[in-house]
């Protein structure tokens, strides 16, 4: 009888340990984050260094206006861009939102991203970096990150694309270090064919070869 009782006690302990181990495995890779959006932005800036690319803090009007976010659903936010945004598309928008608003926020950031991508395609400005944008949703944290050092614009598309991908991988590494994962949810729309066939640049001369002065030139 004692042997049977001892056996069942040992079996119970083994099953308990197995259950605890399974629970630990379930939580593996999940990181509880309590940082504000600004603290996350500061971490990205520190870790990425020259690959951060942003030097201007955006205003709340920009968050609610251009991006269309409902600020009543946003607990904390941080947004930065590059002061020379005409040729440097670096952008970082990070928000911590209330329960149930994360996917709505991600949709709005995706819409804003598509406008940036359209501009980059039209003028062929910083295109490879924009194509490597990251849209992260981790719980109630949502971020659109278009980051990376400036590549050589005179290099081939393949070289620029490789460089941009390497820079984006640095962003993934920092984000993964904070949240435990870095799953990119960005959607890259196909080109609509509206850009010209001159490598993305406008031809400033008309069909008759008339070199009229360009406004502002």
Predicted feature locations:
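C-terminal motif of bacterial Sec signal peptides marking the signal peptidase cleavage site
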Residues: 15-19
């Amino acid at each position: 009888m004692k042997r049977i009782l001892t056996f069942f006690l040992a079996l119970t302990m083994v099953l308990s340990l197995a259950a605890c181990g399974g629970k630990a495995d379930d939580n593996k890779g999940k990181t509880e984050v309590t940082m504000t959006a600004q603290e996350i932005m500061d971490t990205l800036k520190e870790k990425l260094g020259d690959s951060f690319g942003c030097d201007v803090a955006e205003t709340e009007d920009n968050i609610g206006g251009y991006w269309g976010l409902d600020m009543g659903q946003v607990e904390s936010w941080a947004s930065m861009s590059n002061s020379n945004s005409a040729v440097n598309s670096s952008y970082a928008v990070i928000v911590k939102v209330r329960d149930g608003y994360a996917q709505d926020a991600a949709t709005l950031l995706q819409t804003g991203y598509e406008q940036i991508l359209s501009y980059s395609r039209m003028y062929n400005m910083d295109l490879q970096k924009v194509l490597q944008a990251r849209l992260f949703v981790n719980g109630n944290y949502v971020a659109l990150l278009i980051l990376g050092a400036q590549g050589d614009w005179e290099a081939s598309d393949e070289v620029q694309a490789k460089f941009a991908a390497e820079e984006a991988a640095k962003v993934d590494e920092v984000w993964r270090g904070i949240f435990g994962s870095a799953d990119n949810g960005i959607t890259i729309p196909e080109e609509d064919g509206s850009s010209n066939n001159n490598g993305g640049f406008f031809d400033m001369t008309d069909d008759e070869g008339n070199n009229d002065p360009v406004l502002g030139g």
